[in-house]
């Protein structure tokens, strides 16, 4: 690793610790030439699978789109930003764990509904009504009845 102060190519690791629940390594380094110390963070580069849309087109996974959908569903509901971040993290972890290069958008929608169901029932109904394109009140009733079981 190059020293950010003098650009020397030789640095030594003084201390290493796991951070971010074990998903990153924090390293304290010292330059062997100028003796300045600096911190680096190391983490695995995890590639998200591509998304196969309902019409068959493929596009890169868009984390912002996932977050926007969840935020819209939980809008004005008693759900903390921490809970939202955890739910989004679970969805992304599940997608990575499939080991697939491509996943259908339907899978992402179903994962989103699972997370919303455990977070907030009203948010779940909001998302499901748009995602499943409810046409009339009876479809809302069926979704609510499913929640009450």
UniProtKB/Swiss-Prot annotation:
Superkingdom, natural source: Bacteria
Keyword check for Ribosomal protein: no
GO molecular function annotations of the record: ATP binding; double-stranded DNA binding; zinc ion binding
Zn finger (unnamed) location: 3-34
Keywords: ATP-binding, DNA-binding, Metal-binding, Nucleotide-binding, Repressor, Transcription, Transcription regulation, Zinc, Zinc-finger
InterPro entries: ATP-cone_dom, NrdR-like_N, RNR_NrdR-like
GO biological process annotation, one example: negative regulation of DNA-templated transcription
ATP-cone domain location: 49-139
Cofactor(s) it depends on: Zn(2+)
HAMAP family: NrdR
PANTHER family with a match to the protein in the record: TRANSCRIPTIONAL REPRESSOR NRDR
Family note: Belongs to the NrdR family.
Summary of the function given for this chain in its UniProt record: Negatively regulates transcription of bacterial ribonucleotide reductase nrd genes and operons by binding to NrdR-boxes.
Descriptive protein name: Transcriptional repressor NrdR
Native organism: Shewanella oneidensis (strain ATCC 700550 / JCM 31522 / CIP 106686 / LMG 19005 / NCIMB 14063 / MR-1)
Gene that this polypeptide is encoded by: nrdR
């Amino acid at each position: 690793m190059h020293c950010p102060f003098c650009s020397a190519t030789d640095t030594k690791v003084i201390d290493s610790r796991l951070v971010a629940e074990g998903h990153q390594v924090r390293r304290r380094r010292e330059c062997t030439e100028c003796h300045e110390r600096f911190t680096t963070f190391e983490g695995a580069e995890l590639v998200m699978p591509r998304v196969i849309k309902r019409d068959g087109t493929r596009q890169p996974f868009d984390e912002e789109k996932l977050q926007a959908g969840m935020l819209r569903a939980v809008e004005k509901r008693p759900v903390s930003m921490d809970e939202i971040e955890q739910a989004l993290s679970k969805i992304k972890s599940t997608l990575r764990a499939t080991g697939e290069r491509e996943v259908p958008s339907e899978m992402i929608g179903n994962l989103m509904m699972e997370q919303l169901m455990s977070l907030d029932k009203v948010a779940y109904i909001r998302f499901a009504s748009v995602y499943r394109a409810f046409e009339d009140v009876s479809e809302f009733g069926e979704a609510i009845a499913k929640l009450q079981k």
